[in-house]
C-alpha cells in the first residue's frame, strides 16, 4: 500500500492514489490537473521516506473533481450574567480532489486498479453464429 502525507490549506492530509479527498479551496477549474509539491512523507511497500521538512523529488498529482460549499458552522458567543450574545455562521469553500499518482524520484505509484486496467477484449463473433452453434 502506497500513501503520502501532504500539506495543503494549512492542514496535513494522508492521501492514497485512486481516492478522493475534500481539501481547502484551490484556485483551479474542475477537471484540471494539480501537482502538489509539499510532500512530508511517502510510504511504498514498507519503505518510508521522511522529509526534513519536505521529501525532495516527491510530488502528488491529482485532478480537481468539483468545488462546493461545506455545511454551515454556527459560532455562538455569550457572556454569562450579561445580555451579550452573538450568533454567526459561515460555510467553508471546499475542493474535491482525486489523487491520480504519487511520484518519488521519478518512480510513479498509481492505484492498484489503474495499473491492472486494460482494454477489454470483445468477442467479435456475430450473434447468428452463436445461435446456430448453440443448436
UniProtKB/Swiss-Prot annotation:
Region annotation Disordered: where it falls in the sequence: 114-135
Keywords: Ribonucleoprotein, Ribosomal protein, RNA-binding, rRNA-binding
Keyword Transcription regulation: no
GO biological process per UniProt: translation
GO molecular function per UniProt: rRNA binding; structural constituent of ribosome
UniProt-listed InterPro entries: bL21-like, bL21-like_sf, Ribosomal_bL21, Ribosomal_bL21_CS
Entry keyword Ribonucleoprotein: yes
GO CC annotation: cytoplasm; ribonucleoprotein complex; ribosome
Biased composition, class Acidic residues, residue ranges: 125-135
Primary role: This protein binds to 23S rRNA in the presence of protein L20.
Subunit structure: Part of the 50S ribosomal subunit. Contacts protein L20.
Family note: Belongs to the bacterial ribosomal protein bL21 family.
Protein name: Large ribosomal subunit protein bL21
Amino acid at each position: 500500500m502506497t500513501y503520502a502525507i501532504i500539506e495543503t490549506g494549512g492542514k496535513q492530509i494522508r492521501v492514497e492514489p485512486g481516492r478522493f479527498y475534500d481539501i481547502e479551496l484551490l484556485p483551479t477549474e474542475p477537471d484540471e490537473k494539480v501537482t502538489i509539491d509539499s510532500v512530508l512523507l511517502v510510504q511504498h511497500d514498507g519503505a518510508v521516506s521522511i522529509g526534513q521538512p519536505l521529501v525532495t523529488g516527491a510530488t502528488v498529482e491529482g485532478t480537481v473533481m468539483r468545488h462546493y460549499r461545506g455545511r454551515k458552522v454556527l459560532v455562538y458567543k455569550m457572556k454569562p450574567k450579561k445580555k451579550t450574545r452573538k450568533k454567526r455562521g459561515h460555510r467553508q469553500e471546499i475542493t474535491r480532489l482525486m489523487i491520480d499518482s504519487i511520484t518519488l524520484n521519478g518512480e510513479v505509484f498509481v492505484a492498484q486498479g489503474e495499473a491492472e486496467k486494460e482494454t477489454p477484449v470483445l468477442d467479435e463473433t456475430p450473434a447468428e453464429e452463436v445461435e446456430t452453434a448453440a443448436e
